[in-house]
Amino acid sequence: MKNVTDSFVSLGHWPSAGSFGFNTDILATNLINLSVVLGVLIFFGKGVLSDLLDNRKQRILNTIRNSEELREGAIEQLEKARARLRKVEMEADQFRVNGYSEIEREKWNFINSTSKTLDQLENYKNETIHFEQQRAINQVRQRVFQQALQGALGTLSGCLNNELHLRTISANIGILGAMKEITD
């Protein structure tokens, strides 16, 4: 058993300059594997993520266009309301002379209701934009997390097994024993 441990300890050290050897240090090789996996994920996932973001962007832009059309319709209604208001104001001047104040109240009620409608449409547009942005962000986060998790689990299950784990522990114990003998 000691010979196996000694051979593992000697394999765990870097070979001297000019010679060839294998690095069996599991930590160093995992860094390489992880960097390769991350590189592959970034290379291949970039297109999928880009398409997903482009689709989301188009949906958000369509929502913004629809909201702008609603806003333009509301502005058009507001202009009609202003024209009607001018007409009501002229009639109000005529009726004011006669003592009528009912028209004035109707005018202000109409202005307030139109203003509230316009404010509600603006709020609806802003809420829709915010909601679509949050939904797009959450979906992108979820997909990226799932892809990263699947890649990491695939890498881990392909690289680790019990025998390799036990051999690594034995080699590290041997290294620590050798270091203790050197210091004693």
Curated annotation (Swiss-Prot):
Keyword Transport assigned: yes
Disulfide bond residue pairs: none
Entry's transmembrane regions: 27-49
The entry's keywords: ATP synthesis, CF(0), Chloroplast, Hydrogen ion transport, Ion transport, Membrane, Plastid, Thylakoid, Transmembrane, Transmembrane helix, Transport
Cell compartment(s), UniProt: Plastid, Chloroplast thylakoid membrane
Membrane topology, from the record: Single-pass membrane protein
GO molecular function: proton-transporting ATP synthase activity, rotational mechanism
GO cellular component, one term: proton-transporting ATP synthase complex
Subcellular location, principal: plastid
InterPro entries xrefs: ATP_synth_b/b'su_bac/chlpt
Function (record text): F(1)F(0) ATP synthase produces ATP from ADP in the presence of a proton or sodium gradient. F-type ATPases consist of two structural domains, F(1) containing the extramembraneous catalytic core and F(0) containing the membrane proton channel, linked together by a central stalk and a peripheral stalk. During catalysis, ATP synthesis in the catalytic domain of F(1) is coupled via a rotary mechanism of the central stalk subunits to proton translocation.
Subunit record text: F-type ATPases have 2 components, F(1) - the catalytic core - and F(0) - the membrane proton channel. F(1) has five subunits: alpha(3), beta(3), gamma(1), delta(1), epsilon(1). F(0) has four main subunits: a(1), b(1), b'(1) and c(10-14). The alpha and beta chains form an alternating ring which encloses part of the gamma chain. F(1) is attached to F(0) by a central stalk formed by the gamma and epsilon chains, while a peripheral stalk is formed by the delta, b and b' chains.
Further comment: In plastids the F-type ATPase is also known as CF(1)CF(0).
Family: Belongs to the ATPase B chain family.
Protein name: ATP synthase subunit b, chloroplastic
